[in-house]
């Protein structure tokens, strides 16, 4: 890892660790096979290209009249092994939407669709509707029609990096707080683990600064005692238990990923830029030090007898520049814990003092406009300790809420 700005050069610390970790035969296993998939109406149409029009029928349930709506594909905004996401315009209403088009296995239900149908939160991307389309090769595609948000946190970060600037702290607070609100909702209400939190999967409205967690293609409802694949989550943001091959993990893997995103916003570059699964663990050990036997047991009991070279943790204040607020460093340290059960929850992160500025009575955006909604909590506060609720809801917000 390169030296952090204002911090130590850690490059020499990892040689012995790399040799030891390599002996663990930690590797990137292949991607999981297709999951259960299924969906609604089948419509004709070729692959989306600029100017191509896709038509579908919506309605027809609960005495709602059926109607045809058409979308004109305007530009591709994302591609991957899953398929393609393109920006489109509804010809009937003029509304801009994002359509995610994924190849559909006719034998299965689509897990992403099932999860998206179960969610409704201001910090989670919303599904408007969905439809199937076919190609001339008789391939079946599922089209998820979602609200369109023009920017991603990745692009916002890149903008500041290109300008050789750090993201202003007020935006770090605003974006991370909303990420944790979104995670608090998905972890508790539908009870889902996202499993791929990274800047590319966080959308930002540049006018309102509202943030939305997107891309539920890897998401899953985790069931205690049921095995899951460990090769999940993009490398820089992968929790150490996943690198250790754990298959019974919890939603705390998302908390680790969010901690990596927070550190990246503060530093202007990834905290753990590993070049492979092995190197990823090396990068983590160079910062957090060698995990204790108990920490290894919490991540994956199969590795407790494995002998790691003893590397001391690098103090967090040496990773970040001297002017970094102690509250920011404290929050990072509570998120990036080896033991999954020691990481704070998403709601506890929201209540952290790092975000106190957002709770001030007359707090506003730097341009004088109001913040996006921050305190309109609903189901995610069910069964939450009253003390935590009072920390999450400032007095001025309590007057307008049901809590």
Swiss-Prot record:
Keyword Nucleotide-binding: yes
Reactions listed under catalytic activity: L-seryl-[protein] + ATP = O-phospho-L-seryl-[protein] + ADP + H(+); L-threonyl-[protein] + ATP = O-phospho-L-threonyl-[protein] + ADP + H(+)
GO molecular function: ATP binding; protein serine kinase activity; protein serine/threonine kinase activity
Domain Protein kinase intervals: 71-355
One Gene Ontology CC term in the entry: nucleus
This protein's UniProt keywords: ATP-binding, Brassinosteroid signaling pathway, Kinase, Nucleotide-binding, Serine/threonine-protein kinase, Transferase
Active-site residue list: 196 (proton acceptor)
Keyword Transferase attached: yes
Binding-site list for ATP: 77-85, 100
GO biological-process terms attached to the record: brassinosteroid mediated signaling pathway; cell differentiation
Pfam families, per the entry: Pkinase
Name of the top EC class for this enzyme: transferase
EC number annotated for this UniProt entry: 2.7.11.1
Signal peptide: none
SUPFAM superfamilies (UniProt xref): Protein kinase-like (PK-like) (SSF56112)
Record's function text: Probable serine-threonine kinase that may regulate brassinosteroid signaling.
Family membership noted in the UniProt record: Belongs to the protein kinase superfamily. CMGC Ser/Thr protein kinase family. GSK-3 subfamily.
Assembly behavior: Interacts with LIC.
PANTHER family, per the entry: GLYCOGEN SYNTHASE KINASE-3 ALPHA, SHAGGY-RELATED PROTEIN KINASE GSK4
Protein name: Shaggy-related protein kinase GSK4
Organism of origin: Oryza sativa subsp. japonica (Rice)
Lineage: Eukaryota, Viridiplantae, Streptophyta, Embryophyta, Tracheophyta
Gene this chain is encoded by: GSK4
């Amino acid at each position: 890892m390169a030296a952090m700005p204002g911090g130590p050069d850690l490059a020499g610390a990892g040689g012995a660790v790399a040799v030891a970790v390599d002996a663990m035969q930690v590797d990137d296993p292949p991607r999981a096979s297709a999951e259960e998939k299924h969906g609604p109406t089948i419509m004709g149409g070729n692959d989306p290209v600029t100017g191509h029009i896709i038509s579908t029928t919506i309605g027809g349930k609960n005495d709602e009249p059926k109607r045809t709506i058409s979308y004109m594909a305007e530009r591709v905004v994302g591609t991957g092994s899953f398929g393609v996401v393109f920006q489109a315009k509804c010809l009937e209403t003029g509304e801009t939407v994002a359509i995610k088009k994924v190849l559909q296995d006719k034998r299965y239900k689509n897990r992403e669709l099932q999860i998206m149908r179960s969610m409704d939160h201001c910090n989670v991307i919303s599904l408007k509707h969905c439809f199937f389309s076919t190609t001339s090769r008789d391939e079946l595609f599922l089209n998820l029609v979602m609200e369109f948000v023009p920017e991603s946190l990745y692009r916002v970060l890149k903008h500041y990096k290109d300008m050789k600037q750090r993201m202003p702290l007020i935006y770090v607070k605003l974006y991370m707080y909303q990420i944790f609100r979104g995670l608090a909702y998905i972890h508790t209400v539908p009870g889902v683990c996202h499993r791929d939190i990274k800047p590319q999967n966080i959308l930002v409205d540049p006018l309102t600064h509202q943030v939305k967690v997107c891309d539920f293609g890897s998401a899953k409802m985790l069931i205690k005692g049921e095995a899951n694949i460990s090769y999940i989550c993009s490398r820089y943001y992968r929790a150490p238990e996943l690198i250790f091959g754990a298959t019974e993990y919890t939603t705390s893997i998302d908390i680790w990923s969010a901690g990596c995103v927070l550190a990246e916003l503060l530093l202007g570059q990834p905290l753990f830029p590993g070049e492979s699964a092995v190197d990823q663990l090396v990068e983590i050990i160079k910062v957090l030090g060698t995990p204790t036997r108990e920490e290894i047991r919490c991540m994956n009991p199969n590795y407790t007898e494995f002998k790691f070279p003893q590397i001391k943790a690098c103090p967090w204040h040496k990773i970040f520049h001297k002017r970094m607020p102690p509250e920011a460093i404290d929050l990072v340290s509570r998120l990036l814990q080896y033991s999954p059960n020691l990481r704070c929850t998403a709601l506890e992160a929201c209540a952290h003092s790092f975000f106190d500025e957002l709770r001030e009575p007359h707090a506003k955006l730097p341009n004088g406009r109001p913040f996006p909604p921050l305190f309109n909590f609903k189901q995610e506060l069910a069964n939450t300790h009253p003390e935590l609720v009072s920390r999450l809801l400032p007095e001025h917000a309590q007057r307008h809420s049901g809590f």
